[in-house]
Amino acid sequence: MKTINHKEIEKFSRMAEEWWDPKGKFKPLHKFNPSRIQYIKTGVINHFKITSFKTPFSNLSLLDIGCGGGLLSEPMSRLGANVTAIDASKKNIEIAKLHLKKSELKINYINTSPEKLNDKKRYDIILNMEIVEHVSDLKYFIKCCSNLLKKNGIMFIATLNKTLKSYVFAIVGAEYVLRWLPIGTHDWNNFVKPNELNKICSNFNLKQNQEDGIVYNIFLDQWNISRDKSVNYISSFIKN
């Protein structure tokens, strides 16, 4: 079994050069990042009852799955985490390593997928941000992630709900009308409803900890955490 969807990997590999361009094809992720980082930071601090806030993730191991060019990996490292970041696209990892040279951060970037990660290590934190809608076998993917997470570890998943509204906003609006994303970036058939994701996770010893929506404020040009989960949502799970 495998989690890699080669069509998806080829699609993102073609855009790899633009990962760190805030006005390029990954502009939405750059806009998205502050909300994602704050959500993860707050979730980790609350779960592990952390009281040191300068580098709150110190002594915590973190696995960023589907890391792309490292847009989340680098901020996680700055928070003090011992970061391993993986991506099935060789081109993405090359871009991430190249950008890493501009910083003084230490991140272990590996061109692989969770089921092929040759690592006996188990992680305190796992990030699956905007990745589950691009894998070939979601159940197997979640199983592999659970196997890599320590007991009482926390995993974050951000993805798209499978609703009519998500089709209108995330595909028709974002790809065809506003051109925020290249046409074909998303396949609505691969979107997953929160209750379906929760059920899959529960089958692999992952208990939902928190679930929220993320919405775009057109007037402020920023993304915010919200109760509205009809399009984008983010969840955290604790391993039993």
What are these regions (language model features)?
Residues 222-240:
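Core SAM-dependent methyltransferase catalytic element
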Residues 51-55, 60-165, 194-195, 235-239:
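Conserved SAM-binding loop
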Residues 159, 179-196:
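Acceptor-substrate binding/catalytic loop of class I
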Residues 188-205, 211:
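Short alpha-helix
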Residues 166-176:
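Short, flexible, mixed-charge acidic loops at enzyme active sites
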Residues 44, 48, 100, 201:
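Conserved hydrophobic residues forming the short capping helix/wall of the S-adenosyl-L-methionine
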Residues 31-58:
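Conserved alpha-helix/loop element of class I SAM-dependent methyltransferases that forms part
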Residues 1-26, 30:
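N-terminal, positively charged/glycine-rich alpha-helical extensions of SAM-dependent methyltransferases
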